[in-house]
UniProtKB/Swiss-Prot annotation:
It catalyses: S-adenosyl-L-homocysteine + H2O = L-homocysteine + adenosine. One of its GO terms (molecular function) is adenosylhomocysteinase activity. It is found in: Cytoplasm. NAD(+) binds at residues 200-202, 234, 263-268, 286, 321, 342-344, 389. This is Adenosylhomocysteinase. Belongs to the adenosylhomocysteinase family. It comes from the Bacteria. Keywords: Cytoplasm, Hydrolase, NAD, One-carbon metabolism. PANTHER family: ADENOSYLHOMOCYSTEINASE. Signal peptide: none annotated.
C-alpha cells in the first residue's frame, strides 16, 4: 500500500490510506466509551482550554487509543503534530481518522527506519519552522533527536563516530542533513521547549541517564512510574496483549508449551501470567535477586537462558536491556521456537547479527519471519524483534490505556501550568493525581469505595479524601 501525503486546510500529513478514516472514526467512538479517565479529563478542561495554542509534538504508537489522547489534547486547545514511536505499531485507520480531523500525523504501519525518522522530524517541525513547546514521548526518540541535534550544534562529533546499528546511522545522517540546512535549528527549538512527559520504562532510563550526565535540557515528567501506569499498563495490559500478539501471528497452541520470559519487572510479570493463563509452562530469567525471588514464589522456574535452550518453545524478552537473546542462543534453540520481544526497542534480540548471519530468512507473512540455520533448524521471529503486541496485534485494551493517557494529559497540563517554576530534572506526578486517575476508572467497572471516618483518618494520619499512601509505598 502506498502512502498518502496530502493537505487538509493547512495540516500536512502522511498516512497509508486516507479512505480508512471512516473506519477509524467508528473505532475511536467505541474506544472513547472504554476510556473513562481520559474522557473525564477532556470534559473537565475542554471549556477552559488550558493548553490553548501550545505546540505539542507526540511520538507514541499511533493507535485507536492514542487517537483519543490526541483529540483530548486538541480539545484542551493544543496545536498537535504526531508520529508513531515504532515502525510497526501504527493502526492505519487510526492515523487516517486523525489526519481527516485536521491533525498533522506522519505514521503508517511498516515504515522503514529512514521513513520513521523522517516522520519524527516532521512531527517536531511546527508551522513556521518552530519546534514543540511540549513533547509527549514514548521511548524517548523525540527527546533523543532534539538533544543530539543540540549537542551537534555545540560541537559534538557524535555524528561522525562509528555507528553501532543501522538505525544509529540513519539518525546521524538525518542530523547531518538538518545541520547543513540550518546550523542553529535545534538551539532555536530548545529556546521555546518547556518540557517532556515520558511514557515508558526505556525512555525513562534515557531521561535519568541524561540527567546524571548533566545533558538534560528541560523538565521531564516520568509518567511510567505513576502507579496507575506501571502497575496497570505494564502489568495488566501485557497480561492480555502478549498472548494476543503471539496468537494472531502464529496461531500456535500455547497450552503445554515451554515459554521463557526474560525479565520479571512489571512487564515481565504481566507476560509470565499471560502465557501461564493459556496453559504454558513458564520459565523466568532474571538478574535481580528480588525479582527472581518474586518469580519463584509465584511458582515459576527461574534459571538462565542458557539452561532453557533446546526445551523452550516460546521466548519473550521484556528487560529494557540489550542483547538478551544472542545469535548464539538462537542457533541452539529448539527447532521452530518462537522468539519475540515486548520491550520498547528491538535490541533485546540480536537482530542485526541474525540478519547478517548465515541464516536464511523467509517471510511467512508480514511481521512473521522464519530463519533457517545451516544445520536445518529454524526459529520464528515476530515483528522483527520489535514490540510483538503492537506489531502483530493491536496492543493494550482501551481501558488500561485510559489510565496511562490520563497521566500523560495531566503531565502535559502540569508542565505548562508550572513552566516558569519547573527546573530541569526528572519528576513524577504527585500521589494525589495518581489516586485521582484510579478514581476516574472505578465507576466504569462497578467499584464502590469505602470512605474513611474522621476518626479512622486521624488514626492513620491521612486526609479523609487522600492521598492514602506515602510516596515510598509499594503497591
Amino acid at each position: 500500500m502506498g502512502t498518502a501525503t496530502e493537505k487538509l486546510s493547512d495540516a500536512t500529513f502522511k498516512v497509508a490510506d486516507l479512505s480508512l478514516a471512516e473506519w477509524g472514526r467508528k473505532e475511536i467512538s467505541v474506544s472513547e466509551f472504554e476510556m473513562p479517565g481520559l474522557m473525564a479529563i477532556r470534559r473537565k478542561y475542554a471549556k477552559e482550554k488550558p493548553l490553548a495554542g501550545v505546540r505539542i509534538t507526540g511520538s507514541l504508537h499511533m493507535t485507536i487509543q492514542t487517537a483519543v489522547l490526541i483529540e483530548t489534547l486538541v480539545d484542551l486547545g493544543a496545536s498537535v503534530r504526531w508520529a508513531s514511536c515504532n515502525i510497526f505499531s501504527t493502526q492505519d485507520h487510526a492515523a487516517a481518522a486523525i489526519a481527516k480531523a485536521g491533525v498533522p500525523v506522519f505514521a503508517w504501519k511498516g515504515e522503514s527506519l529512514e521513513e520513521y525518522w523522517w516522520c519524527t522530524l516532521q512531527a517536531v517541525t511546527h508551522p513556521g519552522g518552530k519546534g514543540p513547546q511540549l513533547v509527549v514521548d514514548d521511548g524517548g526518540d523525540v527527546t533523543l533527536l532534539i538533544h543530539k541535534g543540540y549537542e551537534l550544534e555545540n560541537g559534538s562529533d557524535w555524528v561522525n563516530t562509528p555507528s553501532g546499528s543501522h538505525e544509529e546511522k540513519v539518525i546521524k545522517d538525518l542530523l547531518k542533513q538538518v545541520h547543513a540546512e540550518d546550523p542553529q535549528r535545534w538551539h532555536k527549538m530548545v529556546a521555546e521547549w518547556r518540557g517532556v512527559s515520558e511514557e515508558t520504562t526505556t525512555g525513562v532510563h534515557r531521561l535519568y541517564k541524561m540527567q546524571e550526565q548533566g545533558k538534560l535540557l528541560v523538565p521531564a515528567i516520568n509518567v511510567n512510574d505513576s502507579v496507575t501506569k506501571s502497575k496497570f499498563d505494564n502489568l495488566y495490559g501485557c497480561r492480555e496483549s502478549l498472548a494476543d500478539g503471539i496468537k494472531r501471528a502464529t496461531d500456535v497452541m500455547v497450552a503445554g508449551k515451554v515459554a521463557v520470559i526474560c525479565g520479571y519487572g512489571d512487564v515481565g510479570k504481566g507476560s509470565a501470567h499471560s502465557l501461564r493463563g493459556m496453559g504454558a509452562r513458564v520459565i523466568v530469567t532474571e538478574i535481580d535477586p528480588i525479582n527472581a525471588l518474586q518469580a519463584a514464589m509465584e511458582g515459576f522456574e527461574v534459571t538462565t537462558i542458557e539452561d532453557t535452550l533446546g526445551r523452550g518453545d516460546i521466548y519473550v524478552t521484556c528487560t529494557g536491556n540489550c542483547e538478551i537473546i544472542t545469535l548464539e542462543h538462537m542457533r541452539l534453540m529448539k527447532d521452530q521456537a518462537i522468539v519475540c520481544n515486548i520491550g520498547h526497542f528491538d535490541n533485546e534480540i540480536q537482530m542485526d547479527r541474525l540478519n547478517e548471519s548465515d541464516a536464511k530468512r523467509l517471510q511467512i507473512k508480514p511481521q512473521v519471519d522464519m530463519y533457517t540455520f545451516p544445520g536445518g533448524s529454524s526459529i520464528f521471529i515476530l515483528a522483527e524483534g520489535r514490540l510483538v503486541n503492537l506489531g502483530c496485534a493491536t496492543g493494550h485494551p482501551s481501558f488500561v490505556m485510559s489510565n496511562s493517557f490520563a497521566n500523560q494529559t495531566l503531565a502535559q497540563l502540569d508542565l505548562w501550568k508550572n513552566k516558569d517554576t519547573y527546573k530541569v530534572g526528572v519528576y513524577t506526578l504527585p500521589k494525589k493525581l495518581d489516586e485521582e486517575v484510579a478514581r476516574l476508572h472505578l465507576e466504569k467497572i462497578g467499584v464502590k469505595l469505602t470512605t474513611l471516618t474522621p476518626a479512622q483518618a486521624e488514626y492513620l494520619g491521612v486526609p479523609v479524601e487522600g492521598p492514602y499512601k506515602p510516596d515510598h509505598y509499594r503497591y
